[in-house]
Amino acid sequence: FSEFDMDDSGYQDSPTILFGQNDVFNNMAGYNFSSVRFRVRGYSSESQDVYLAGVRMNDAITGYTPYSLWSGLNEATRSKESVNGAEVSDFGFGGYNGLTNIMPMASSVRTGWRGSVLTNSALYRLRLMLTYASGQLDNGWSYAFSASARLGGNDWIKGVFYRSFGYYGAVEKRFGEEHKLGFTFMAAPGERGAQNGSTQEVYDLMGDNMYNSNWGYYNGKVRNARVRKTHEPIAILKYDFTPESQKLSASATVLYRFGKNGYTALDWYDAPDPRPDYYRNLPSYFYMDNTDYNRRNFAKYAWAKEAWETDLPSTTHINWDRLYAVNSLNSTASGNRSKYVIEERRVDQNDLNFAVNAKWNPVKFLTVNGGLSYKWNRTEYYKILDDLLGGDYYVNIDQFAERDFAAYPTMIQNDLDYYLRNGAAQTLAQGDKYGYDYYAHVRRAEAWASGRFTFGGFEATVAGRLGYSKFWREGLLRKGLFPGLDDNGNPFTYNGEIITKYDQIDGRPITSKGESDKKDFLTGSGKINLGYFISGGHRIYADAAYITEAPTFNQAFISPRTRNTVMPDLKTIKTLTADINYAYSNSGYDVRVTGFYTSIKDRTDVMSFYDDSQNSFTNFAMSGIDERHVGVELGFKVPTPVPNLSLQGVFTYGQYIYTSNPTMYQTYDNSAEYVAGTYGVVIPYWKSHPVHKKNDDG
């Protein structure tokens, strides 16, 4: 529960805008099943590609699609094209879990005025939307604008609120019959209070599974400590070439994403954990019905139990008054030093994209599509001091490093260079950066092409893609735990003792400042789609693909907030997938039946957590994760005698399993030393693993 933006096991909410295609299964899976966190074919969310004006929008760092960038702009982003599974599209090679291209240009928005008011959403109490599009005027110009507001929260989770807005503006000019140039600018700024997961003990004590530990009363009002704040505008410049012959058409798009994305959280130093559901604040900390338990204090247990069961605000929620009081009483010569503050963890992207796509029809039975794309991304990760909570200043030191290295003042510094220049740790005012600050750099280039052949009712498509990816970390601060070498190439020392740490495997100094090794990957992929249209709306088709992809930045660095260490033995991810389908669409009836098989090899996963067995915060990295996804899908829509009313249903059955036991690397976060005695030999066995189990020799 330490990260507000945690992966959540590969699940990500998918808005209905992505599933407005003529496919019953995907429509229901994307909308009706989103509340139960359904994953199509068991795939993780980054496997779904989403394009904006021909530019792939999947996040350069995580691979996920940033749906929130256009959230609330439904009318402006309604026009789109989609394909399922491993099908090949006219606007991109895609992956193995479908591809959607949203067209947010002025001429793509439906002509006229549109407005709406909604009051029954699970996320907010009120939504207002207004959109206007001129359509193409006689002078060749088109323009459109849209605005929205979504306000309120919900009534069943206390402390949660939602304030989100959206704005969109686009102009487009047609020059003659062959050329068109358009510009679009849009964003969805907003903020929302978050809910936090807790433990079953807390839910039982409160009698409420919707309990939220993130809030408390301050000056008589509800205040949430964890608030997501975003404003990331997107600017798009798109050129289209459509000659009268229609044998050759092309488009070129430049897209730039920028702005800020952050969320707040409590931070503290030399003070008790302020979270109400921290384990030391619960009854079970004082007494458990266990003969081996060594903290038996029934009186404190009874007091804590009563406080929780009666919902005593100072116990069950953040006690803001106490935090302010502690800060105001911590007087020093420089003023009141805050022990509790609000931090904002920022992830600010600069993402520049260029894409060219072309379509060629040399003969009636052949269509050739292809394209080139390039992505330049620099994302800055850092923290800023958002609120001193009544104090005058905060100090930029690492309290977790201080626990292990209190005798080494240089090693507890978050900014060692500042300490060496000034002889003291940096004092912080509101708005200052602190803790960590680094760039994630990503460069990605891609070329793809496809050929579609049609003969009567038979259709065949073959496609290929070549890609190149490179990423690296650039630390902007020198952390005392991992100083690396000084400007003269010498190790750092304290009182004659070397404090520079060296990698246990390759012997190189571990650094936090400057550029890491640059990891690059060359990938190649191929697809084939075969289909046959039978009379009367019947169709059978099959898809197959072999896809290689580079790992993402966030699955490559073991602890990017502290150091430049890259996960050992990084490999491309290899996916082999195939499906066979029957579809029927006629007279209001729609049916699709699919059988699918997917094998994924060499995934990686990186996580950090406090390991009780080691009594330390650790980094846990796994490589060589293999998966298999096998199953069937059925979707149907049947008209009823009542006009505009149909019966819809879906069914799926699948087996999604791990087919390998990965290699694990576990390191102490404060020292980068390996927990396991030998590098890379510890293999965690999946619980109830259906394929690989330990033999008698282990």
Language-model segments: what does each one mean?
Residues 1-39, 44-46, 50-88, 150:
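Periplasmic N-terminal accessory/gating domains of Gram-negative outer-membrane beta-barrel systems
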Residues 119-152, 156-195, 227-245:
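Transmembrane beta-barrel wall of Gram-negative outer-membrane proteins
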Residues 180-236, 262-343, 406-432, 606-609:
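Acidic/polar loop-and-plug regions of large Gram-negative outer-membrane beta-barrel proteins
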Residues 198, 202, 412-427, 470, ...:
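Surface-exposed extracellular loop regions of Gram-negative outer-membrane beta-barrel proteins
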Residues 221-265, 334-383, 428-459, 515-525, ...:
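Outer-membrane beta-barrel transmembrane strands
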Residues 341, 367-535, 648, 684-685:
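Signature of Gram-negative outer-membrane beta-barrel scaffolds
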Residues 596-601, 618-698:
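Gram-negative outer-membrane beta-barrel transporters
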